[in-house]
């Protein structure tokens, strides 16, 4: 093409320079000035990587002064172009704009514009873009979004609760599962779903101070959710940036004490527009109608301002009726406003639970029970169901299940309360206690005697705690460097035990970090035993590394030495040997220690080793835990209650272990209390609530469906392809692990989700669970979601040119592969993607206007194509530009019918689903007062807005690839 001064060209290799203007021409070279950057470039007149910029009728172009022109006519004179059309700001017609006056900052966003401007991408990027569109659309349609990407085992009851609650508008529920059943994971899954769906954007978690780091770790490791921990120093720091420090972060964890002791903080928290509040250990907030505690009032004030509330608490039976009512009152003060009324109502529900027990037991129903069922379900004619349920026919079981479902809908608190018990959830291992009685060394005997004399002024509580840890008493008198481990028989026993069990992974827990560190040194120096240490002094990354070292089968540590606090929130169910080097001071901590191994999914018996020194507080505490509470071999829901009621007597025995008069009677009394409370708890079991919380078949189906999605081959190949194209380094490790690190040539300098020093990932859920340092990559992982956004929100792969070597077709045959996207724009919380995700419609057009996409599948077609360099691509495009315009017009006419069909299907599906949900809630409200009015109103508004936005859905061209046939 001949060059003329003033012509506008664009660089094929440096498109960021904007539009260039020809400012100098000689025999062999031309000079382009790029006004947007002020830079000049010198190019050869022949075969330079530059493309002439020419617009067509119907394009909109921008003048360098900022106004826009809708092009209607294009003229050329002396090699320079003039565009004639309508000026959009003044609507003046017949306006002429010479090309030299075009805005130099011009960028091409439409795929066809980029193609004609020579901004052509590699064909592998085009393929990646199409796959990204296809897979993203498929993932949006799956109903369990937010549940798949969790780094946790697929436990049916957890998935059921999370799915039920996570789908709701502003859920306000009580999660009251027994210890070890995963309330934290349930809450995390609900948070994850609400965030992914756009129902929540700002989340506040309030927990006891000792659990802050545990929650921080759990949210990050299991759900890839980065919360900010607010304490005094972080609060002061944030106060410099904002009048309300809590506005500086979207997701915050803080302690209840941090809020309680400062009125201004509470007001700022309440004003910070949170969407979801999560409160752990909610049963510790005391309440009575006359005098609610300060802690309770704090949460009450927050719950009044925040639409969604999750309270994690002990089981209602452990709480007692009044305390249980207090939690429900936080969730719905209008519904639960009077305690006496609540008690009367609960008594009315007792017969419902009894009826369910009968139905589930398959027993024949007496006339009294039949009448009761008739009264409980009074608005429908259920005679045929009752008759079938009481018959011996094949329909009996189905009729009983239907009656149970009807009763469940009418159950008092089933929508606001979820509670599973170990009795109702299968899959827990047996626990076997091994008591190892060891002699008390003379060094300790002397230290304990001296301590008794010198510590006479200490409180009973302090003396009891001292007596549990004789090595610390010894160090108090002999100095911190005293080598207690040289004579403590527990150390010798531990060494022998580990040597005898070389093939087993062993978790050793002790109260103090210093003890763990000293034991590691002894194991290493005396028997060369590889041990990892895990304590509160380590950073999160250091803890992950220690846990990964312990988990590794190859060259990993045999032993993990944990301090009490350091082990919070970590689970090691790949091990089954637990050594308690000392004992914790209360039953909750004991259960927490055993809970590191005693989880659902543990498939071996847990061997609990307790080496203790005779004639010490340790010996008394072992007896009290085992004989009084049965707390080693079974979970102990009564432990805290008995501990609180017998605390003074217990610590007096621990503080003076030599005085054991009455100890046997004390332990016997505690055992009787334990058995009595256990019986009460069992009799108070609400089978209907357990059924509702457990999820039954629904939970099983969810777990199975998600398991089938695990190890998705499409995900693995897509992810590796994505990492290659984005420029992320990949290094294969053993055990299905890949190390990802940033490179110097990435598409973006900082890839969101990829740490600066890289990370280890796996696509295998089981591997991720056994390796603390490996992230579990699913379609929901931030690296994949951010990768999809990076590709699809930009121009990557939006236009390409390829060659098809096929002797069956004439040379020069032209095909246009077009990818349209049918989509609706709407606020994220409406979740339009459930019904109409951005859906790719692929077309393969020939010169005759025929769409060959149905006959030619994408992947097989893509494998036959060859890449073309950018310069040759530009030449090919310029040669067939007019034909491509015609093919695009033909495709536009064809795509409309497909797009409209997709939109109509989405509208029908949305109307059916949302109308059914609404009708069900309205019907339930008639028989169950726990359906909130605002929930029904929100669903009604949601349905209306979804249908309105679907009516405005449209389609656009997302990507184009020209394919030219060659025989060479």
Swiss-Prot record:
InterPro entries: Helicase_ATP-bd, Helicase_C-like, Helicase_RapA, P-loop_NTPase, RapA_C, SNF2-like_sf, SNF2/RAD54-like_C, SNF2_N
Motif DEAH box mapped to chain: 280-283
Residues noted as binding ATP in the record, renumbered to the chain: 177-184
Domain of life: Bacteria
Domain Helicase ATP-binding: 164-334
A Pfam match: SNF2-rel_dom
PROSITE patterns: HELICASE_ATP_BIND_1, HELICASE_CTER
One MF annotation (Gene Ontology) recorded for this entry: nucleosome array spacer activity
Keyword ATP-binding: yes
GO biological-process terms attached to the record: positive regulation of transcription by RNA polymerase II
EC number of the protein: 3.6.4.-
Residue ranges annotated for the Helicase C-terminal domain, each copy included: 490-644
Keywords: Activator, ATP-binding, DNA-binding, Helicase, Hydrolase, Nucleotide-binding, Transcription, Transcription regulation
Top enzyme category: hydrolase
NCBIfam families: PRK04914.1 (NF003426)
Family affiliation: Belongs to the SNF2/RAD54 helicase family. RapA subfamily.
Chain's role: Transcription regulator that activates transcription by stimulating RNA polymerase (RNAP) recycling in case of stress conditions such as supercoiled DNA or high salt concentrations. Probably acts by releasing the RNAP, when it is trapped or immobilized on tightly supercoiled DNA. Does not activate transcription on linear DNA. Probably not involved in DNA repair.
Oligomer and partners: Interacts with the RNAP. Has a higher affinity for the core RNAP than for the holoenzyme. Its ATPase activity is stimulated by binding to RNAP.
Protein name: RNA polymerase-associated protein RapA
The species this protein was found in: Yersinia pestis
